[in-house]
């Protein structure tokens, strides 16, 4: 059964139950997440024993805020639209990723998932197919270059990408300009501690996010069926928490309107129909790089 056939089996009551959003669930998850950031950040700030090692988990926590911003593009983490917007824009600053721009980019990705020439995630961003490309992918060099060019391009460029509605160009330009001004002010006035609490950890943590994201569509068929072009990865509760349940990624692509806390329920309903399932990220990674030896 493909994802469209599955959706036809759901009645109105099923859909309403799955699509029910909650400010309480979203805020509770966010508070726990911020508490974890507070612990790792305090450890670094007060230079507690082995604080240098703590830079890595702190950076992973910052980098994985990407998954919350990703959810905010769908307005699903919280019931209140303004909470999704505020969270999305705050994370935009931390990750150098404009929220409004990312929303249109990501919605196009959902519309044309894994279809070459249509999915913007595939435009100039081929999945690594050799050790050299894999190392470069994890180094995040391409990520940082892309974010710099997006910020500058959105602020002064023509904004001609097909996924950007013409009527939104002014908003995207204003967003990019405001972010650039904010970065100039912050980096000109912020204490050195900010470097160790934000930039250095983010650089160290981003490779983990890149490896995680590779599992979502890497080596999946270039077809329209979300149960085949997207991978669900069975993993630990810690990773599920860190990624806001996005390892249930095929389920998310089949029903993007389902909030993170309902994805485990949706997984139980779709498990028998999923065509791409990996038993953990380590197994996925080993299987992925094994082809490099051929």
Provide a role label for each language-model segment.
Residues 19, 77-96, 117-133, 224-239:
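Juxtamembrane helix-capping/reentrant segments at transmembrane boundaries
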Residues 1-61, 68, 94-198, 261-294:
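Non-catalytic, topology-defining segments of multipass membrane proteins
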Residues 255-257:
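Solvent-exposed interhelical
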Residues 158-163, 226-248:
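Active-site-proximal inter-transmembrane loops
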Residues 59-72, 98-101, 147, 198-224, ...:
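Transmembrane alpha-helical segments that form the membrane-embedded catalytic/substrate-channel core
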């Amino acid at each position: 059964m493909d994802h469209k056939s599955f959706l036809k089996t759901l009645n109105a009551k099923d859909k309403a139950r799955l699509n029910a959003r909650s400010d309480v669930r979203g805020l509770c998850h966010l508070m726990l997440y911020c508490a974890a950031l507070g612990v790792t950040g305090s450890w670094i700030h007060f230079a507690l024993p082995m604080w240098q090692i703590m830079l890595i988990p702190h950076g992973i926590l910052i980098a994985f805020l990407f998954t919350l911003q990703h959810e905010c593009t769908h307005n699903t983490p919280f019931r209140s639209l303004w909470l999704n917007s505020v969270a999305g824009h705050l994370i935009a600053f931390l990750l150098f990723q404009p929220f409004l721009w990312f929303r249109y980019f990501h919605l196009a990705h959902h519309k044309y998932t894994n279809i070459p020439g249509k999915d913007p995630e595939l435009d100039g961003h081929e999945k690594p197919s050799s050790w050299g490309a894999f190392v470069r992918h994890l180094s995040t060099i391409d990520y940082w270059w892309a974010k710099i060019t997006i910020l500058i391009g959105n602020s002064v460029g023509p904004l001609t990408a097909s996924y950007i509605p013409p009527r939104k160009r002014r908003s995207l330009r204003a967003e990019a300009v405001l972010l650039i001004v904010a970065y100039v002010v912050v980096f000109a006035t912020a204490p050195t501690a900010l470097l160790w609490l934000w930039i250095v950890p983010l650089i160290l943590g981003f490779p983990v996010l890149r490896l995680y994201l590779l599992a979502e569509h890497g080596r999946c068929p270039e077809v329209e069926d979300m149960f085949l072009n997207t991978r669900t990865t069975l993993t630990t509760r810690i990773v599920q928490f860190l990624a806001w349940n996005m390892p249930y990624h095929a389920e998310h692509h089949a029903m993007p309107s389902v909030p993170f806390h309902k994805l485990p329920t949706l997984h139980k309903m779709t498990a028998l129909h999923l065509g791409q399932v990996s038993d953990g990220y380590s197994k996925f990674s080993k299987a992925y790089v094994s082809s490099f030896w051929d």
